[in-house]
Amino acid sequence: MSGRNVESHMERNEKVVVNNSGHADVKKQQQQVEHTEFTHTEVKAPLIHPAPPIISTGAAGLAEEIVGQGFTASAARISGGTAEVHLQPSAAMTEEARRDQERYRQEQESIAKQQEREMEKKTEAYRKTAEAEAEKIRKELEKQHARDVEFRKDLIESTIDRQKREVDLEAKMAKRELDREGQLAKEALERSRLATNVEVNFDSAAGHTVSGGTTISSSDKMEIKRN
């Protein structure tokens, strides 16, 4: 008793290759292997040998249990040839890749423009703040200059006022000195003494009369010095 069984197996492998332009080329390798098996079976009369049951594990034991005693099996496998097939990406895939690249470029440009706009806003805000601060500083400097001028003016006026008061005070002191000198002069005149020699000859019918006297005038001498 004999028979033939034919089995076909298909193996497929896919390979992805990235070329220099950045596109992905998909290459599919298709391998078809045809296996042919031939089985020859010989039937023999079974021999009965009572034996204790044996439980075997593994592929050999399982095959022996399936076939049974008295049967032998032989098989031969023949491998066929292989063929390699290269597949190019379709037009749809190429268009999709082009759209992806264009979208990527647009997103990059959008990011760059957004960052540029943000920098412009920040620069403008910083410029306005700096100008406002500079204006405040300028006004404060003007106020400080006005305060300096007013302070110098006050110093000059204060100095002039002090000198004027000193002159007035000196004039008052000089007048008082003159007043005191005049008072001293008056007192000196009051303290002066007079001494006079007088001789009077008086002739009359009654006779001849002679009278005399001495007057001495003296005064105290005082020196007044002014610094």
From Swiss-Prot:
Disruption phenotype: Results in a significant decrease in survival after desiccation but does not affect survival under frozen conditions.
Chain positions covered by the region annotation CAHS motif 2: 163-181
Induction: Expression is highly induced during desiccation.
GO biological process: response to desiccation
KW Secreted (keyword) present: no
Record's keyword terms, sorted: Coiled coil, Cytoplasm, Repeat, Stress response
Primary localization class, coarse: cytoplasm
Coiled-coil region list: 91-191
Renumbered residue ranges of the record's region CAHS motif 1: 126-144
Signal peptide boundaries: none
Compartment annotation: Cytoplasm
Disordered: region residues: 1-35, 86-126, 206-227
One Gene Ontology term, aspect cellular component: cytoplasm
Lineage: superkingdom: Eukaryota
Residue spans of biased composition, Basic and acidic residues class: 1-15, 24-35, 95-126
Similarity comment: Belongs to the Cytosolic-abundant heat soluble protein (CAHS) family.
UniProt domain comment: CAHS proteins contain 2 repeats of 19-mer peptides designated as CAHS-motifs that comprise each two octapeptides connected by a tripeptide.
Note: Trehalose, a disaccharide essential for several organisms to survive drying, is detected at low levels or not at all in some tardigrade species, indicating that tardigrades possess potentially novel mechanisms for surviving desiccation involving tardigrade-specific intrinsically disordered proteins (TDPs).
Function: CAHS proteins are cytosolic heat soluble proteins that seem to contribute to the anhydrobiosis in tardigrades, but their specific mechanisms are yet to be identified. It is possible that protection during anhydrobiosis might occur via the stabilization of vitrifying small molecules such as sugars, but not via the direct glass transition of CAHS proteins themselves.
UniProt name for this protein: Cytosolic-abundant heat soluble protein 94205
Organism whose genome encodes this protein: Hypsibius exemplaris (Freshwater tardigrade)
Gene this chain is encoded by: CAHS 94205
